A protein has these predicted regions:
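Catalytic-core segments of nucleotide cyclases and related cyclic-nucleotide turnover enzymes
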Residues: 54, 58, 62, 90-121
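A structural signal for short, well-ordered beta-strand segments
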Residues: 45, 84-88
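Residues at secondary-structure transition points
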Residues: 10, 14-18, 55, 74-77, ...
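Catalytic core regions of nucleotide second-messenger enzymes
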Residues: 39, 68-84
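Cytosolic catalytic cores of cyclic-nucleotide second-messenger enzymes
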Residues: 3-51, 55, 59, 63, ...
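Hydrophobic pocket-lining residues within nucleotide cofactor-binding pockets
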Residues: 1, 52, 73, 91
Length: 122
């Protein structure tokens, strides 16, 4: 989630929790039954899109971004706008999963540096 630390610092951890819930609700409505999502740490998640080409995966995550940023959630009578950045990669047969996660993580940080609320391929 973009600017998650600032959200927590300025509005409190309950606002951060609500942002995570808003993201989870959006994910559950958008992803396919075969897709999986897991919290990776803090405000970072891993989304597994089995049998999905990387360009199609990028389109799926872009749809997720539009769905999340298309709606606001309320926290203590304030409307909160939430976005997220994502890095995407394809798992290469025989590689360590950590290597794929590292590529996705690098792409994530490139997306954040490039202005946030975007998905880049790593």
């Amino acid at each position: 989630i973009d600017n998650f630390k600032r959200l927590n610092d300025e509005l409190g951890h309950s606002a951060g929790d609500e942002a995570l819930k808003a993201l989870a609700a959006t994910v559950s409505k958008t992803l396919r039954p075969t897709d999986m999502v897991a919290r990776y740490g803090g405000e970072e998640f891993v989304v597994l899109l089995p049998e999905t080409p990387v360009d199609e995966g990028q389109q799926i995550l872009t749809r997720l971004q539009r769905s999340l940023s298309g709606g606001l959630f309320m926290h203590e009578q304030k409307q909160i706008f939430v976005t997220f950045s994502a890095g995407i990669t394809a798992y290469r047969t025989g590689e360590r999963i950590e290597d794929a996660l590292e590529r996705a993580d690098l792409a994530l940080y490139q997306a954040k540096r490039a202005g946030k609320n975007r998905t880049l391929i790593g």
